[in-house]
Amino acid sequence: MSNSLTSAGLPLEGITVVSLEQAVAAPIASRHLADLGARVIKVERIGEGDFARNYDAAVHGLASHFVWLNRNKESICVDLKSEQGREAIIDLIATADVFIQNFAPGAAERLGLGAEALRSDHPELIVVNMTGYGTAGPLKDRKAYDMLVQAETGLCSITGTPETATKTGVPASDIAAGLYALTSVQAALFRRERTGAGATIDVAMFDATVEWLGHPMYMQMYQDTQIKRMGLSHASIAPYDAYPTLDGQLLIGVQNDRGWTQLVTEVFGRPELADHPRFATNILRVQHRGEVDAMVAELTREFKTADLDDKLAQAGVPAAQLNDMKALLAHPQLEARDRWREVGTEAGPIRGVLPPMTFEDVEMRMDAVPALGQQTDAILGSLGRSAEQIESMRSSGIVQ
């Protein structure tokens, strides 16, 4: 990646997305669409806007979640319960290719912004409804937040230590739903290019999380085995954990029997362990996990962390440092791959990391995070509202 690349020619240039969004699931989907070149207009409520704006004040007074998920967007702040505000957003959606919403169940329909109503006038529109639990079933009307969905799906039951179930350190259910929404929009745009047809797409956080639970679900279905919470270990692989060194610890993950042979022969100098009757195959090593882990830990304690890391790399055995966020910020891999960019905000420039999709000839957008309602006037003006009409709407509390 080179700083000399520009964002001209991104795949979704010319696509307009209107997103009635809050929190994480819809914002991460729309932000990635914007990264890829789409124009994304974020519709926010009067007053506080997206409530994620107020999660914390860690980034020069702005919320860390919000600056992460909302660069490259425009913000229009409208009272959707008012007739004028609702009409303005309906007019805005009429100019769009994609409409995304992740408000509470039934809210979009009550506002006249349901898929059926919108697509009756605009059949080419792609509508994405993002919910917690889907549009049917006993939980369909429940509000859903990431932790609740992680718990309801059983993700928490396999995450954490033997003593304590935990949620993941990032909002996994939100992110999963957002990425499936992103994929579905791209697929729908591709289909529309061929057929002219729009789409109505439902993406549930529950379903997205269940999709990620395939391995533990199959273990339960066909072996009647509940995956145990094992911290950094892996239920089906050994050795796979953080092991102590002379000055710290290092993660080692042996994925197959060849890796085991490389570990004990090339790293530890113990070739007799490669074909040991209790350790020769992964199934055997999992059965004797306690003995394997104790033996590996005894051998890793003979090395300094950096020396062991180098030796594992030379032998082709997968290993990693157990870094924290401070170490990540200084990680040489980010620097070597030129991943850092500057992103504008109302509080001044901040650092941001490029999206993970890397095109060789064009750079993903890294434009500013909008202030609340920053583009309200410009967007309303583009919809034919005069300056006088906009000022009247503002004085009436309809826009901000």
List the model feature ranges, each with a label.
Residues 1-16, 228, 244, 327-400:
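Terminal low-complexity tails and localization/encapsulation signals of metabolic enzymes
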